[in-house]
């Protein structure tokens, strides 16, 4: 059972507002009269009223109840709400924990009486005051949820998107467009193969040719052909010409394999010729095609000669309904046909609409949609207010300065046109205009002329130009379906402005007009970190930031620099999808310092999540999305990803979002050459051998070396990251202070030191060649003379604590770890605390998503205040308890001790006790339970230590 018609979101929001007012009144009445609010007495009315908000008839509520067996007991019970393939709902009495309702719903789904074909993707639970909605994992109902949201009844009208599945939006709209787009891309692949064979394999994405001249001539010509054919296929099904299927009939009835190429070229010429300039003797079919104008058919192409297979591929494409495609999805796929891997990939490489909306939604779209919904849903809104808001939509400029095939621009335009259509319909209803307008062109004010894109690579830019026209026509049809016939768009007189060029070299102020409203800039510039940027790109960054030292700044920060320059005298906002490294390490003060100093704040942010690359063969990138404005309102929005491949979870923001994407003080942590805290010992690199492996003793060499009694005197345990983490044994020859006579007497020492000398002497580095004079010494030595703390360079993000160990001075630390003198255990205790790993996660750098330790950035800045003797002793004792707990299982490595799914209870208890002492020392007045609480203390302490 579904609703008879899809309700628009404004109506749903209005219905939900009335629903919450009515049910909040019920709850107040129950509480005032001390009446019990039990599920059995009120749940069916509650579900019925909720479903009614989405156009589902409450009289049919009995259809949604269902008997089912529970997996835990084997007994049969009654599901409160069940819509096969859509949702299962459970209600509990007022005040009851919703976990009980959620678990009961899952129990029914796992009971075996509900067939797989009817398993719903959603669970909804309520105790009348609170609701919980869960989108289940598609692979297994009992597995981790895709997303899970809990909110109060008072907030229900703010959660239209999470409840939209009840109105069938999810299945009836986007999925159909997505599947159509995938099928359309396969047809284009078939055409490309037919025209070029399957051996063509060219770079796509950031590495694609930037100009047609750089492209293989045949591939370039095919690319232009396919762009034009796409326009014609779309025109057939979307009503661009008066005669339906005009192009398909032309190909099928008036061409042969031999004549198709020249006839297509003739058609292209005609489409670019005004009606009055055409020959009067044109054949009838060709004469029916309208004048297109624009740049689509402007250039003359060399004829393409088709064969039977090529013509059949085109006819197959003609049989498809091209009006159904999501142009933003299709455009992303279309640009990839030149890649052999992408052609075989069955369409998995594209940026989803969901990911695009994560950027443009909180930047501007959600705000405009909310304003429109409130105006439309209120019967008291006069036509004048609706028209004023619609006029305002036409005052904004929208730009993607790294637009690719235009998917961000296409999605933004499509969604904004839907907002405008709702406003037009509402205005007409209030004026009493119930009939269809004879011409709606005068009613539409939002224009593709407000949309701008910059793109370095020529073919995506060409696709974007064409795709913007196609999505404009789709939007016109939606408007026409609501109020009248679509406006005439041929010949093309208004186009989106897609500029083919290097965005970082363009003067944006010359390309983008001054907007009467705001300029919104957004997109996902190239994912190039400091390690993958070229020297030319590094020079671009130096010029843009006006700094010789750009350190580790990612290439994407060039777009931030351009925005700061552009917005110096203009109003607007901007947001980019970027690699997550811009919010880590020393990039944070370098990037966010100038942004904040220019008066910007973070309007919204998505913390680290996996963004699938559009380019085939490229792994998912760990990204963040950060949006900026210069306003005071609204309150900033922040989303976290407990699972980087999962759904976002909203994080409440009380103050502001800082450069580390944390709700807290706007502090920027700078590298320090020595510890800020008087309690910390300097952490330094371990010892680097530079020996060609000849001073190291592997497990299979140990017995041989130890058999030499002289060499055996100098064998020491050797610890790098792997040995530290996994308890592996490795040794080295440590000959610092060795007796020269011993070296002369030992064949093993002589042989190995001779090999070291030869290795160093052959080095290209002068510093290494000089070390050949002292082959018995490690090339770089920093070994402490006391017990010390050993810290790995990288720790898994899954670890609950930073995995460190104390060693005695006779254990040699390799250059793959850091070490800090720790004679009394204080350094170990501080580094083992939740406070330290919180600091590391917050301000430290990362390797992909793993934590990367840096002495100058995370250790030297760790803001431990000066401790009194008693506090210091308590922390040291608590740290020793952690070591004692580890010692209960001496066979376990650090990796095994700190497996987040299998930490020993004794070890967890010891860490909890340590945390209480360290938290208290950092200034906590009560027990801390969240990362956020620790972050607030850490930033406050850092500000004190730096007088910030």
Predicted regions and their residues:
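Signature of N6-adenine DNA methyltransferases within the class I
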Residues: 70-77, 94, 98, 102-104, ...
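Flexible phosphate/Mg2+-sensing switch loops adjacent to catalytic phosphate-binding sites
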Residues: 59-64, 245-249, 371-394, 416-450, ...
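Non-catalytic DNA-recognition/assembly elements of restriction-modification systems
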Residues: 403, 748-756, 771-772, 861-948
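Polybasic, glycine- and aromatic-enriched phosphate-binding surface used to engage nucleic acids
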Residues: 93, 110, 557, 633-634, ...
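A short, conserved, highly charged catalytic patch centered on acidic carboxylates
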Residues: 1-122, 130, 138-140, 776
């Amino acid at each position: 059972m579904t609703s008879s018609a899809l309700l628009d979101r404004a109506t749903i929001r209005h219905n939900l507002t009335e629903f919450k007012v009515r049910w909040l009144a019920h709850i107040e009445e129950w509480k005032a009269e001390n009446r019990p609010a039990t599920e059995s007495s009120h749940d069916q009315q509650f579900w019925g009223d909720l479903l009614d908000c989405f156009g589902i008839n409450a009289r049919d509520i009995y259809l949604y109840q269902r008997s089912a067996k529970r997996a835990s007991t084997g007994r049969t019970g009654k599901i409160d709400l069940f819509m096969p393939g859509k949702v299962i709902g459970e209600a509990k009495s007022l005040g009851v924990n919703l976990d009980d309702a959620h678990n009961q719903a899952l129990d029914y789904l796992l009971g075996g009486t509900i067939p797989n074909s009817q398993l719903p993707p959603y669970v909804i639970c309520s105790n009348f005051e609170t609701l919980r909605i869960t989108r289940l994992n598609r692979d297994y109902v009992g597995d981790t949820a895709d997303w899970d949201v809990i909110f109060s009844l008072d907030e229900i009208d703010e959660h239209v998107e999470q409840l939209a599945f009840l109105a069938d939006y999810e299945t009836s709209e986007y999925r159909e467009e997505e599947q159509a787009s995938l099928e359309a891309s396969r047809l284009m692949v078939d055409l490309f193969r037919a025209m070029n064979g399957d051996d063509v394999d060219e770079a796509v994405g950031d590495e694609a040719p930037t100009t047609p001249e750089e492209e293989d001539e045949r591939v370039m010509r095919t690319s232009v052909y396919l762009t034009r054919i796409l326009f014609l296929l779309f025109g057939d099904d979307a009503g661009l010409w008066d005669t339906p299927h005009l192009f398909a009939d032309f190909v099928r009835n008036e061409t042969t394999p031999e004549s198709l190429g020249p006839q297509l070229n003739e058609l292209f010429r005609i489409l670019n010729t005004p009606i009055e300039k055409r020959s009067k003797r044109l054949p009838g079919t060709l004469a029916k095609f309208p004048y297109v104008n624009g740049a689509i058919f402007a250039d003359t192409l060399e004829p393409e000669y088709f064969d039977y297979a090529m013509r059949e591929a085109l006819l197959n494409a003609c049989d498809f309904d091209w009006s159904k495609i999501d142009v933003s999805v299709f455009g992303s796929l279309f640009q990839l046909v030149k890649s052999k891997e992408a052609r075989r990939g069955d369409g998995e490489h594209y940026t989803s609409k969901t990911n695009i909306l994560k950027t443009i939604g909180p930047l501007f779209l959600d705000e405009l949609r909310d304003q429109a919904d409130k105006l439309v849903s209120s019967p008291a809104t006069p036509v004048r207010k609706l028209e004023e808001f619609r006029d305002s939509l036409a005052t904004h400029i929208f730009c993607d300065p790294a637009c690719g095939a235009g998917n961000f621009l296409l999605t933004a335009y499509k969604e904004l046109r839907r907002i405008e259509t709702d406003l037009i319909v509402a205005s007409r209803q209030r004026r009493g205009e119930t009939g269809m307008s004879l011409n709606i062109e005068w009613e539409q004010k939002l224009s593709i002329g407000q949309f701008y894109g910059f793109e370095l690579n020529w073919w995506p830019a060409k696709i974007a130009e064409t795709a913007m026209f196609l999505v404009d026509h789709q939007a016109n049809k939606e408007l026409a379906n609501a109020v009248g016939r679509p406006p005439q768009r041929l010949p093309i007189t208004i186009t989106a402005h897609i500029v083919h060029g290097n965005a970082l070299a363009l003067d944006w102020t010359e390309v983008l007009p001054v907007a009467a409203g705001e300029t919104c800039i957004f997109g996902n510039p190239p994912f190039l970190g400091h390690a993958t940027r070229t020297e030319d790109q590094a020079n671009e960054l130096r010029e843009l930031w006006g700094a010789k030292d750009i350190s580790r700044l990612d290439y994407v920060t060039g777009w931030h620099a351009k925005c700061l320059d552009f917005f110096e005298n203009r109003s607007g906002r901007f947001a980019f999808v970027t690699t997550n490294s811009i919010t880590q390490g020393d990039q944070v003060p370098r990037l966010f310092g100038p942004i904040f100093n220019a008066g910007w704040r973070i309007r919204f942010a998505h913390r680290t999540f996996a963004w699938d690359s559009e380019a085939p063969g490229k792994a998912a990138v760990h990204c963040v999305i950060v949006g900026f404005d210069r306003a005071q309102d609204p309150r900033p929005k922040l989303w976290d990803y407990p699972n980087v491949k999962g759904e976002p979870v909203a994080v409440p923001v009380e103050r502001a979002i800082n450069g580390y994407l944390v709700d807290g003080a706007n502090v920027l942590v700078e590298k320090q050459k020595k510890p800020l805290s008087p309690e910390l010992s300097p952490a330094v690199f371990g010892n680097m051998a530079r020996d060609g492996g000849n001073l190291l003793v592997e497990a299979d060499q140990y017995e041989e070396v130890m058999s030499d009694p002289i060499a055996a005197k100098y064998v020491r345990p050797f610890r790098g990251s792997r040995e530290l983490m996994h308890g592996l044994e490795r040794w080295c020859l440590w000959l610092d202070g060795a007796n020269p006579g011993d070296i002369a007497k030992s064949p093993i020492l002589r042989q190995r030191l001779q090999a070291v000398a030869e290795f160093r002497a052959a080095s290209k580095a002068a510093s290494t060649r000089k070390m050949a004079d002292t082959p018995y010494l490690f090339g770089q030595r920093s070994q402490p003379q006391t017990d010390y703390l050993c810290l790995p360079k990288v720790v898994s993000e899954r670890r609950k604590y930073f995995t460190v160990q104390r060693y005695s001075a006779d254990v040699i630390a390799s250059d793959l770890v850091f070490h800090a003198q720790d004679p009394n255990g204080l350094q170990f205790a501080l580094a083992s605390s939740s406070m330290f790993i919180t600091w590391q996660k917050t301000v430290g750098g990362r390797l992909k998503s793993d934590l990367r330790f840096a002495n100058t950035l995370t250790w030297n800045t760790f803001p431990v205040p000066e401790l009194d003797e008693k506090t210091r002793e308590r922390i040291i004792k608590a740290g020793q308890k952690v070591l004692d707990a580890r010692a209960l299982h001496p066979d376990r490595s650090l990796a095994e001790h700190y497996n987040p799914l299998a930490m020993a209870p004794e070890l967890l208890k010891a860490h909890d006790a340590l945390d209480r002492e360290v938290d208290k020392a950092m200034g906590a007045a009560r027990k801390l339970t969240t990362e956020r609480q620790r972050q607030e203390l850490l930033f406050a302490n850092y500000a004190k230590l730096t007088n910030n």
